[in-house]
């Protein structure tokens, strides 16, 4: 089976099986397209990058279904990927590389990306939380979770201690206490420091400015300022 045929089969599998709202097919395809952009001109195994990107969140439903907070969707995605990749004729070396990329894409763990393919996946995945799409995703979550459109807290550390689980997935305990402003302070503005590639950092700088400017305009409108 040719590489392009294998990638198309993976795309079909992902389209048919992605059921987790937090890690849906739209997110996967955005990350996939961004990986293609970031990888232009790079000497990498493009089939490894494409396969890993398409499968990186396939285990999201398992994490969401685990109320204990001990399940890591990156680990689960790597487990699910292995037999599928074997079925499609990937070599053991490629399967191992793809699994490593998937496992290391998670922001909240110490599994750091080592290869360029893994770094590109990590960067593209994080960029999807920023910019216009980041605003859209966050406010979709805000509406679904009945959280605040606008809310700031005086002590971020105290908020984290009070409202964040220390389990592997770092879940928010009470989503109704959360807000875009809090999410920006505790995570989004720090993403750029974690990125690996210069291309991604350049994109992140632009997207962070958009996000920050949006929050500034939102605050003025909430407070009735002209």
Language model regions located:
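His-Asp-centered metal-binding catalytic motifs of divalent-metal-dependent phosphohydrolases/nucleases
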Residues: 46-66, 73, 77, 81, ...
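A short, mixed-charge helix-start or loop-turn motif at secondary-structure junctions
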Residues: 13-18, 63-64
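Short alpha-helical hairpin
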Residues: 1-12, 53
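Divalent metal-dependent phosphate-bond-processing catalytic cores, especially two-metal-ion Mg2+/Mn2+ enzymes
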Residues: 17-43, 55, 110-226
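Short, flexible active-site-proximal loops enriched in glycine and acidic residues
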Residues: 44-45, 89-97
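Acidic catalytic motifs of isoprenoid enzymes
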Residues: 19, 37, 70-91, 105
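An amphipathic alpha-helix signature
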Residues: 7-11, 32, 75-82, 99, ...
């Amino acid at each position: 089976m040719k590489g392009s045929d294998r990638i198309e089969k993976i795309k079909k599998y992902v389209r048919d099986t992605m059921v987790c709202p937090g890690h849906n097919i739209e997110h996967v395809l955005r990350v996939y397209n961004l990986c293609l952009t970031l990888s232009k001109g790079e000497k990498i195994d493009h089939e490894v990058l494409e396969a890993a990107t398409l499968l990186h969140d396939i285990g999201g439903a398992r994490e969401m279904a685990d109320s204990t907070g001990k399940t890591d969707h990156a680990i689960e995605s790597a487990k699910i990927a292995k037999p599928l990749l074997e079925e499609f004729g990937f070599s053991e070396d490629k399967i191992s590389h793809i699994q490593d990329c998937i496992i290391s894409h998670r922001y909240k763990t110490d599994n750091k990306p080592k290869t360029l393919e893994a770094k590109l996946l990590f960067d593209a995945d994080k960029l999807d939380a920023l910019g216009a799409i980041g605003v859209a995703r966050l406010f979709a979550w805000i509406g679904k979770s009945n959280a605040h459109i606008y809310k700031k807290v005086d002590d971020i550390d105290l908020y984290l201690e009070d409202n964040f689980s220390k389990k592997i997935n770092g879940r928010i305990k009470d989503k109704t206490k959360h807000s875009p402003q809090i999410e920006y302070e505790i995570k989004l503005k720090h993403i750029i420091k974690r990125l690996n590639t210069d291309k991604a950092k350049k994109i992140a700088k632009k997207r962070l400015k958009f996000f920050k400017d949006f929050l500034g305009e939102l605050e003025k409108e909430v407070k009735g300022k002209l």
